Each structure stands twice: as C-alpha cells, then as structure tokens.
Amino acid sequence: MSSSRRSRSRRAGSSVPSSSSSSRTSISEDQIAELLSKLQALLPESQARNGAHRGSAARVLQETCSYIRSLHQEVDNLSETLAQLLASPDVTSDQAAVIRSLLM
C-alpha cells in the first residue's frame, strides 16, 4: 500500500480495509505494530535485543515461522525419544505408567 493511500486512510479515521472480505474486521497500523511487538517479544532471539531496534514486519514474521518450525522439530525429537524410552526393556511398567500419566 502506498504511503499516500495510508495517509488518506488515517485522515478519514478508518483502518486499512481487508481486501479478501469486507465482513472481516479491519485492523489499524497501530494495532499491527502492537501485535508485531508482542510477537517479537515471544521470540527467544528477541530477548537478547529487547529494546534494541525493532525489526521489520517481514523480519518478525520470518523469525516467528522459523521459531515455530524449530519447536515442531523439537516436539518430534522429544516424541521419538519418549517412544524409544517407553519401548526400552529397562523401563518398568510402573515407570511407564508414571510417564504416560504425565502426558495425559
């Protein structure tokens, strides 16, 4: 969106309309900036540079997607480790029951 279009939208007191559906609630640029700031604060890399320069929206979204992918990979790895542990002959049925109860 061009800056002149954004300026006109702000002057009119309306938020940027959704192009996909007029029934969706529009969201203002300030709300987007606030949401991006909150999202950035959730990223572990952002903790180190907290208060430093704010990343672009694209950068924050890229980092978020990367972080979510890494979390999915970590869950997969932990699930595999847990499955191996439960299948191990060294784990007693009592220990396996405790592990299963913790997962539910």
Swiss-Prot record:
Chain intervals with Low complexity compositional bias: 12-27
Known tissue expression: Expressed in leaf blades, leaf sheaths, lamina joint, stems and panicles. Expressed at low levels in roots.
Family per record: Belongs to the bHLH protein family.
Highest taxon in the source lineage: Eukaryota
Name of the molecule in the record: Transcription factor ILI1
GO MF annotations in UniProt: protein dimerization activity
Miscellaneous notes: Gain-of-function mutants ili1-D (T-DNA tagging) show increased lamina joint inclination and hypersensitivity to brassinosteroid.
Keywords: Growth regulation, Transcription, Transcription regulation
Subunit comment: Interacts with IBH1.
SUPFAM superfamilies to which the protein is assigned, alphabetical: HLH, helix-loop-helix DNA-binding domain (SSF47459)
Induction: By epibrassinolide.
Source species of the chain: Oryza sativa subsp. japonica (Rice)
Annotated region (Disordered), positions in chain: 1-27
Role according to the record: Atypical and probable non DNA-binding bHLH transcription factor that acts as a positive regulator of cell elongation and plant development. Binds the transcription repressor IBH1 and forms a heterodimer of antagonistic bHLH transcription factors that function downstream of BZR1 to mediate brassinosteroid regulation of cell elongation and lamina inclination.
Domain bHLH: from-to ranges: 16-71
Any one biological process term the GO annotation gives: regulation of growth
Bias (Basic residues): 1-11
